[in-house]
Every structure is written in C-alpha cells, then in structure tokens.
C-alpha cells in the first residue's frame, strides 16, 4: 500500500514525545513496484525511514522478504481479502504457518481463500511480547473447515485480545463490512482466556452516501472500552 499505517504510527509515536525514527524500524512488503515507491515517498515526506521490499520477492504468500518471523514487536496490516489460487506447496515452503495450511483443493493444489494465511503470518511475525492489529474480511470470523481449525488453535493460544465488527462503507474501494483483529502475546494473566468482542456494525458517522467513519469521540469511546477491559 501507500504506507498510511506507517505514517499514522509515526505521528502517534512522535506525538507521545518520542522519535519514531529512533524508537522504531519500519518493514514492509509490496508486490507492486509503483505502490512500494509511493510508500517510500509518503514516509520520506513525513520524515520516516523504512525498508520496503517490492517485486516478486515481496509476494507475502511465497516469501518472508525480511526474515522477520518471531521478531516483531508490532504488526499492522490491511491485506487484500479472499485471495484465491495460492499455490499451497510454495506457501507451505515459505513457512510462517504455526497452525497449518487453510483448505487446499485436492485437484489443483491451490488454497481457495488466503484469509487465514494472512492471519497466520501476522501471528507468526510476533515476538514473545508482540502485538498485532489488522483488518480482515468479516467472513473470516466464522468460516468453516480448515479455517475453523486454525481459528480454534489460535484462540487456544490465549493471544487473541480484541475483535471489533465494523459496518459497511468504511473504505473508499470496498463497501462490505469487515472486522478488526488484535493479538497480544503479553496479555495480563487474568485476560489470557478472555477475548473482548465489540459489535460496532451500527456505530459510525456518515460522511457521504458511500463512506462512513468513526468520529473522534466515537474512537475515544471504543478506546475507553478496550482500556477498561485490559
């Protein structure tokens, strides 16, 4: 993408009185070269440095371009939803699958929906105290078969922290609802077997006919709920 999450993270860290460039190292993979250059330019404009890999080696399904499995303090992502025709053998060889592969077509040897590849990657990148937050298709919260098996294993780790259901029209290019997932491998012991679910599908401010958002006070309300839970 264009690095928007990096920029927002940098702004947040800088606003807290720290220097994002000295406190954090930003890594990214972007298959499309143009998008990678746009990301680097966006970061440079905002005074940030990043290591962004592009091209074939940046295909996350088949490469861990930065060799970051088990090393990340934070993971943030907005991956493409419901990607199909992922080569299962290549994906398996690339690793980062602590809970196994999602469903594979026995005839084509392809993964029909890559949502749980992404979810597995984000978890696999975290170190022992790492935290992740990412956007995911709503269908991933109750998909069946191999997805359900992976989801069960993930929940049993105790590291799933918060799930937020989001309504329609929160993206310029996507009208479907989505979910926000948050992992925390350093949860308080009393929360280890708990997950906070927030149904925010009908909680939004209308921007125009095709776009909704959370206002500043709505965001603060959601943050307060999570803070009280934690």
Give, region by region, the residue ranges found by the protein language model.
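Conserved S-adenosyl-L-methionine
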Residues: 1-77, 82-84, 89-93, 136-139, ...
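A conserved structural/catalytic subdomain of Rossmann-like adenosyl-cofactor enzymes
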Residues: 69-230
């Amino acid at each position: 993408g264009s690095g928007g999450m990096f920029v927002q993270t940098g702004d947040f860290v800088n606003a807290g009185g720290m220097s994002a460039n000295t406190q954090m190292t930003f890594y990214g993979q972007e298959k499309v070269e143009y998008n990678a250059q746009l990301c680097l330019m966006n970061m440079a404009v905002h005074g940030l440095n990043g290591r962004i890999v592009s091209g074939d080696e940046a295909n996350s399904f088949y490469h861990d371009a930065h060799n970051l499995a088990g090393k990340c303090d934070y993971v943030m992502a907005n991956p493409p939803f419901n990607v199909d025709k992922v080569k299962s053998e290549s994906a398996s060889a690339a690793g980062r699958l602590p809970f196994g592969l999602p469903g594979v077509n026995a005839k084509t040897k392809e993964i029909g929906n890559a949502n749980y590849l992404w979810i597995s990657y984000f978890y696999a990148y975290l170190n022992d105290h790492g935290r992740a937050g990412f956007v995911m298709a709503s269908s991933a919260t109750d998909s069946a078969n191999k997805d359900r098996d992976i989801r069960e294993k993930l929940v049993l780790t105790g590291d799933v922290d918060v799930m937020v259901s989001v309504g329609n029209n929160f993206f310029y290019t996507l009208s479907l609802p989505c979910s926000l997932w948050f992992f925390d491998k350093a949860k308080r012991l009393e929360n280890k077997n708990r997950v906070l679910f927030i149904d925010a599908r009908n909680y939004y401010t209308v921007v125009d006919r095709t776009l909704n958002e959370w206002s500043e006070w709505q965001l603060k309300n959601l943050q307060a709920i999570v803070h009280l839970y934690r």
